[in-house]
Regions:
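Mixed-charge interfacial surface used for oligomerization/domain docking
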Residues: 10-24, 30-208
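Extreme N-terminal basic, low-complexity initiation segments
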Residues: 1-4, 8
């Protein structure tokens, strides 16, 4: 997993104290499984707050949706895949020459799964949108929100945004583009574009 849960880094007493503080201050403690999806969940929770939903209703919604946030992403910079052990040095060198883009997702445990590879950015965008059609709520009739994050490749993010908006005409608003944070970017590298959306339950490792 690319991140450690807070409970894994604390002793039992510290974790129990945090839970007690949350209970006393009206703060809900939720294990989001993976940090990359927080923006979409927080945005949805804020919408429910504005609709007048209670804390319990919002918490239940987040708990239900946390495994339904999909993360589809591709990368054009293979040396970071080599550094993280997802690709051998020889494969990274050959892939760079051929313009290979790994297509990745997060599984139900929040682990990065490289499930396909294509040649060129256009094919990477097309494969990402194709996968989104298969997993998004109501398929091409998806009416939820979609976010895109990128690491120093705004043009690629904008091209992906255009493809997503063309494929999903009923989106809830314009696709929002954000920067990938420095911690995640240090793992994924520059040239990474990620698409976030609500869909079916994220599949475990070994599934498409």
């Amino acid at each position: 997993n690319s991140r450690c849960r807070a409970s894994d880094r604390m002793n039992t007493g510290e974790y129990t104290n945090i839970l007690q503080i949350c209970n006393c201050t009206g703060v809900a403690q939720i294990d989001d499984i993976t940090v990359e999806e927080d923006g979409l969940l927080v945005d949805g929770a804020a919408d429910l707050r504005d609709e007048g939903k209670s804390m319990d209703e919002i918490t239940d919604w987040v708990l239900e949706k946390r495994k339904k946030v999909h993360h589809q992403f591709y990368s054009t910079e293979l040396k970071f895949s080599r550094r993280s052990g997802r690709m051998s040095g020889a494969a990274a060198a050959i892939g760079t020459v051929l313009g290979i883009c790994p297509i990745m997702r997060l599984d139900d445990k929040g682990r990065i799964i490289a499930y396909d590879k294509v040649r060129g950015k256009k094919n990477a965008v097309a494969r990402t949108v194709e996968t989104m059609k298969r997993h998004a709520e109501n398929g091409e009739n998806y009416t939820g929100k979609a976010f895109i994050c990128h690491s120093n490749c705004l043009a690629d993010a904008e091209a992906t945004k255009a493809a997503v908006e063309a494929a999903f005409p009923h989106l809830n608003g314009e696709v929002r583009i954000c920067d990938i944070g420095t911690i995640v970017a240090s793992h994924s590298g520059p040239g990474t574009v990620a698409v976030f959306f609500f869909g079916d339950d994220r599949a475990p490792e070994g599934s498409a």
